[in-house]
Each structure stands twice: as C-alpha cells, then as structure tokens.
Amino acid sequence: MTWLLNWREVAVLDANAEALGVKVSDLMAAAGKALAHKAATMAPEGEILILCGPGNNGGDGFVAALELIEFGGTVRLIASHKSQKGEVAQSFRTKCPSVEVWKEGCDFGTPSLLIDCLLGVGLKGAPRGNIAKMIDWVKPNNPPLVLACDIPSGLGSKKFLAADATVTFHAEKQDMLYIDVGEVTVAPLPWPPETVNCGPGDALCYPPLDPSAHKGERGRVLIVGGGPYHGAPILAGRAAARIGCDLIHVAMPRNAVDRATWPDHLIPERLFDEDHLGERARDEIFKLLDEKSFDAVLIGPGLGRLEETTNMAREIIEKLSELEIPTVIDADAIYALDEGVWPKGLTGVATPHAQELRMWAWDEEPSNILAAEDIPSESRVIIRTGSVDQLTGLEGRYCECIGGHPRMATGGTGDLLAGAVAGLLAQGMTPWSASRLACYVMRVAGMMTANEFGPGLLASDVPPHIARALSNITAD
C-alpha cells in the first residue's frame, strides 16, 4: 500500500487486522520493538526518557522500554495518567520495572533522547489536560534529540512536540508533510495483505447517531433513473434507506412512476416525460435541485441509453458539479461521461462493471481518470464491480472487496450497491469511506440473503439484510 493514511484509516485497518486474527498485543509488540531499535541507533549511550500517553501509543512506549532495558539501556518512564485505557497497553505497563506518573514540577533530568509516545494519529484537535501540560514542560528543557512514535504529539495544532525523527507504522500519514516530523522511518506491522481491503473496520467511519436528530438530518438523496427499467431506481432507493439515509426521492418518467410498486419510505418525483427522460425532465430536475437541499444524488439506474436521455444525464452531471453535490454515477449514466475523463469539479463515485469501464476508460487506468484537480484525497472513487469489487481512489488509493456469495451475481444488485453508496454520501461520509463500507456491507448482506433464500435469491430480498449487516458491525 502506498497512499498516505489519515487517522480514521489507521483505526479502520487496525480493526480489520484484528478481525483477521491479528492480536493487538502483536501489533503493539512490533511497533515498540521498531521504536526501540531506532532509539538505540540515535542514542547508544545515556538515559532515554520515554513519555507515555494513556492509549495504545503509550503502550508502544512501554514495549520499547522493555526492549531497551533487556539490551542494557538506561530508561526512565513517565506516564501521563495512572493507568492505560486499553488492557493490552496496561499489561505491558505492568511489566515495566518502574513507571512515574507525571506531575507539575517533575524533574526533567538530562536524557540523551526523549521518546514521544504521548499521542498517536487518533487525536482530534489540540492536546488537552496532562498531555498539553507535559508538552509545555518538555519544550523549555530542550532535549537534545526527540524521537516520535507514529506521529509527533499534537502535530497540526498550535501545541505540538517537534521531532528529530519519527518511526511510523505500515505507511506514512497525511500529517507527515510537515517538517516537524524529522527523519521518517516506516516500520512494518504484522498485518496480512488483505488488511487494506474493505472490512468490518470500515464501520468506524459510519456517522454516529445524534440522539437529538430530526427527520432529514441523516441525509436526503435524489435518485434519477427509470424509464425502460422502473425497478432499478426503486431497488437503489431501498438500499439507501436500509443503510440509514432518512429521505429518498426517486425521479422517473410518469409512466414508470405509475408502473412501479412504491415502498412507503420512498418519495416519488413524477416527471412529465412519459417513457424516457429528456430535455423537459432536465429542467424539472434542475428545479428539484434548486428547491430541495439534497445531500447526494444518484443518477443512472434503469435510465436507458437513448441519445436524448444520455444528453440529459450529461447536463445533470455538469449541474451537480457546479452545485458541489456528492454524486454517484451508475449504469446507463456512465455512457454520458466523456471518454477517459472524470467530470470536472465533481465529487463522488462511479460504479461501472467491466464492460462499462472498458467503454468509458478504454486504455486508461482508473487512477489516471481520477487524477487532475487539487482536491481532497478521498473525493473521487471508481468501483469496478464484479465478483471482486476493485476500488480506485486518488493519490494511490486502491483496495478490493472480496467475499459475499456468487448468487449475488443477479440483476439489480448493482443498483443496490449504488444506492447504498449514495445513502452513505448523504450522511456525510467521504466517497472513499462510503465506497468501502457500502461494498463490505453489501457482501455481508448478500451472504445473509443467500443463506435464507438459496437458489431463489432476488435483489429485492437483500435490502432488509443490509440493515442487519450494518447493525452487526456498528455501535448503533
């Protein structure tokens, strides 16, 4: 894996590794030993002062201390709190011969090296409490060398501890573009290769439920499709609802609206065009976009490929780029895209199967289609759907989603995936995180559905299991 990880992705991949059978103690041991090895090369003589925070970053520090002591080093340990938050970190702490708890006025001493294990990449915002006080305590003492564990504490805020060197794990982190990280060493972790693929850890990015939330605050989606195939937008809408989105509007030609069987939770938008969407529908959809605050739009399911319809889809996609509304481009709407080009300014996800991707990309790699403007690294994704979903994002992001059941290779399941992605985008997830979680949840839901229905599985059987699969891996 080559992309720069953010703090959410680190937690996701740690959880995926644990689900694959990797013990937290093994991860901590590997991190601490790598840290100790670097420390020994930086300060072969003299005392090494290790500052440990209350989390797993502190646990890495305790492992490093044990390793250094075993090989004859002189180590002084100071913890920010009386105990660690996690059992594994606490178990390593109790193995250390002596751990001081920091208090104001504590003597700094004359260490040859300070190891910063106060905070890892999981911190959001500036350091607080004892951690902030310890950083203020360190700075005037001006230690000769500082080695950071994973990332310098407080990096990116006004209160941080600059490092001469940093040992980070598995891959560099986004904040490491700062000069204050010093020389960076990337140490491996005992993660199986599939750790980076979609997995249960992706549920950590699912937006938590606000107890005071009102109707509509979990997202509003517009689905544009239908015409020759009225069932596809309905399936997409059902998936968006079952993945937690509040309000789902489905815009179709009036004859398609009249033919469809409408679930109670979907809101029909009956467009004037009778059988397929064209210029008049474009104007109606523009009006909808102006009148209602949609958090995400899905265009394509069941749309058809008439020239008038394709032209309409192209203009709507351009409008969505202007409005900066996250968008999922699926099925027939992919034929509205210019060859080998991502729509300028658009944030979102495209979900082509192999044939659609060949038509759109020709000889271009998906990563080349995405690359262009200066935008956040999680803003664009191409999901090549199939027996193995292949997800390509910006700046080297790539992963796969495996598993599920082969009976999910049936008509309508692609519409479900597109709807699930749109539902997550509407709830505020980034295109990259939404794509990963939607792909994983669909695989789990597909397995549940296949176990219930066997050879008779239909795409319409899947949506209730989307909710069950999501519930199994989230805290809600």
Describe each region flagged by the PLM.
Residues 1-82, 90, 165, 176-331, ...:
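Small-residue (G/A/S/T)-rich helix-start motifs and N-terminal tracts that mark the onset
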